[in-house]
Amino acid sequence: MNPDTNQPTNELHKGSLASKLLKFGIPLAISVGLCVALFRDIDFKEMMRIIREECNFWFIGLNLLIGLIPIVVRAARWGIQLKAINVRPPFRILFYAIFGTYSFNVVFPRLGEVWRSGYIAYRQKAPFPEVFGSMIADRLADTVVVALLTLLTFAFASAPFIKFVHTYPDAYDKIASLLTSPWVWGGLAAAAIVCWALLRFGKGKFISGVRNFFKGIWEGFAAIAKMDGKGKWLLLTAILWSCYFLQLYVAFFAFPMTRELLEANGIIVAIICYMLTTIAMGIPSNGGIGPYQTALIFGLQLFAPAAVSASVNPAAHKAFLTAGAAFGNTVIAAQTLTFIIGGIIVFLLIAADRRRNEAASDAPSHK
């Protein structure tokens, strides 16, 4: 056998392996790296003691209970979008898809959204590109909301961030130089132009397939403009993000340190931590583990008393970080455990639903 005949297959496997490493290796490395950096600056034994002895788990339970509401609301909201492309799954199926997405993302970051689109398309025998497009529209709507929340937070609660700039000028300079770099924006513009040119003028089956795929995505996204129930969709969006905030807010009462920060500074502490953790969840990682705690502790530090500054009292600063880590790790661990256990139940229900459908389709018809 000519060894050259295996070369394309070998290259395909290499590409597949590289793709898997990018999809799963990078998010895992981010989660592990941030957790290692986090635990390096805290007293782990003291953190565990705080969780065991000081945490009021009733508020953590309330946090988890409130967390179920956004899943129900998101399922209802996506159902409105799917109706616009004539896809009408039962509500329980939408709930399975949304809950399964969160569970899927714990193990396979960023693939949960692809999975839910594929699941709905397969079960409802609908075109995948259009269902995927409606999902993209769903996530883009969330991106717009996050951007608006971020702007509002910076506009009305800029004092803590100004404090950060004065405390860490080097970090601010690095971020500013990156955002204003012509090389960064030029590279992004060049990549966009190349992609547009390939899709516009390229030929071949692959390019044609990609073009049709994006056409389906656009049709799913454009369906929002003509869908019925826009008012209900906007109301559900407001409820969704209000519940996300309420979920974090009630968790602040679970620990003495976070409760005291709320009492001293007001609800703005929770608002800023909510905004930062929401942005952090966009970083590819396993269920937000790593970025979530890092963003939460950073937000808490913005309101830390001067007496716990690292330059003034290193021991007190470490104790503050440890208490913040206890808070962040408890919240993310409880949510992750819920998604794992709930995900197992949901996937069992999906399997049972599939068996019922297969049995119904195989059953002989009686005339």
Which sequence ranges carry the predicted segments?
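Membrane-embedded alpha-helical segments of transport systems
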Residues: 100-108, 130-155, 326-342
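Predominantly cytoplasmic-facing regulatory/coupling regions of multi-pass membrane proteins
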Residues: 1-99, 156-282, 312-313, 320, ...
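Transmembrane alpha-helix interface/packing and boundary motifs in multi-pass membrane proteins
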Residues: 100-109, 272-293
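Alpha-helical transmembrane bundle and helix-membrane interface signal
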Residues: 117-128, 133, 146-149, 156-165
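Membrane-interface alpha-helices at helix entry/exit sites of multi-pass transporters
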Residues: 91-94, 111-114, 125-139, 307, ...
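Re-entrant/interfacial helical elements at transmembrane boundaries that shape
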Residues: 113-122, 285-302
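Short helix-loop-helix connector
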Residues: 85-86, 122-124, 255, 300, ...
